[in-house]
């Protein structure tokens, strides 16, 4: 039978088929997307304009992506079975010491959110902005003797990226085992030659991808946003920086770049290594070498590495923000480059204001993603009307992800206050319970607030109607950004 592609019936059948596929996809979204906002944000366009939304849904949708989540959980189980013979997690004493500490109660439910326990006797150091961060990371790698683990969302083949590449090549030539993991989507601009040079020099480097095989190119929504460096099991780093010149303030439109990292030593480094091992095992089906020191210090601060991701049994990242806000009795200060809270987190912020808590959120004054910036602006205006003090950082782009609760609890890591970090990305955050370290974080944030402009009720009223329309459209699609 010959199909006449110029027949009006052909186009009628084609449109009917597209609308039928749109209905099927909308039903799939309703059954698989975890949140009502996200389900509606997908289902309505799929029903009414499927010819514009079917392909984006194939690429960005299918939130629960059950096949992937099942495979990821299975890989994690296999990895932990493989680790069983390593006498890993020998932190019983540090975990018991943490639980017996008076500071432990300040975390409330937070220690139960993650797979890894809160541990005592750690040392932490605040690293403010790119120079301090990469000076410390490079100095630590320079002294490496056994194993270096490096994981970033973005690696650029620029001045900083090349400096890291040369340093890792030099250490590999000295006999150090070097492992590098980067996200395939975040590092999409990284040329294959960058990785090949490292491989030729003895460095093991792999891209983190959601799935193996050709279909992976159509599934870009799950991204590994973690930033982890561990050297010899003795010194580690996590925070907001990626590897690129812009993180040193070399991007004219976004400079100076404001970001925060933290340097860590102590038993919690075992947790950072375990998080890296899970991602490395998923990418390679092999375990990297994991190192434990012979002894730990007898004193230090309470820390917990909170790793989160779409394969978790619960929405770990959003629950962390909820519990951090709910637990605040005096203040909760949050800095994030994106401010797209879901209904629960927004309600928690509103309730904290009603309890008399000093609630402040610091966001950028310059956009790096215009749609996300527009959505963030509308949420910021609504937060101001709810009594939250919202600030825009003025000197340059703000990329740090920091939470300060009352006088003891701080969190520094890779997680943003948005739907992507809540439900789509793999993230890692370091929770620290220590008044001295919290004082340092407070001083750092106080300086940031002094360089910020507070958003006022007048700002919300002076916005042009076209801008308001754009913000509302951006907010409508924010659950799928």
From Swiss-Prot:
Record flagged with keyword Transferase: yes
Coiled coil: none
Domain PLD phosphodiesterase: 220-247, 394-421
Membrane topology: Multi-pass membrane protein
GO BP term, example: cardiolipin biosynthetic process
Active site: 225, 227, 232, 399, 401, 406
Keyword Cytoplasm among record annotations: no
Catalytic reaction annotation: 2 a 1,2-diacyl-sn-glycero-3-phospho-(1'-sn-glycerol) = a cardiolipin + glycerol
Localization per Swiss-Prot or TrEMBL: Cell inner membrane
One function term, GO molecular function aspect: cardiolipin synthase activity
InterPro entries documented for this protein: Cardiolipin_synthase (IPR022924), CL_synthase_A (IPR030840), CLS_N (IPR027379), PLD-like_dom (IPR025202), PLipase_D/transphosphatidylase (IPR001736)
Positions of transmembrane segments: 10-30, 40-60
GO cellular component: plasma membrane
Enzyme Commission code(s) on record: 2.7.8.-
Keywords from the named record: Cell inner membrane, Cell membrane, Lipid biosynthesis, Lipid metabolism, Membrane, Phospholipid biosynthesis, Phospholipid metabolism, Repeat, Transferase, Transmembrane, Transmembrane helix
UniProt cross-references to Pfam families, sorted A to Z: PLDc_2, PLDc_N
Role: Catalyzes the reversible phosphatidyl group transfer from one phosphatidylglycerol molecule to another to form cardiolipin (CL) (diphosphatidylglycerol) and glycerol.
Family: Belongs to the phospholipase D family. Cardiolipin synthase subfamily. ClsA sub-subfamily.
Record-given protein name: Cardiolipin synthase A
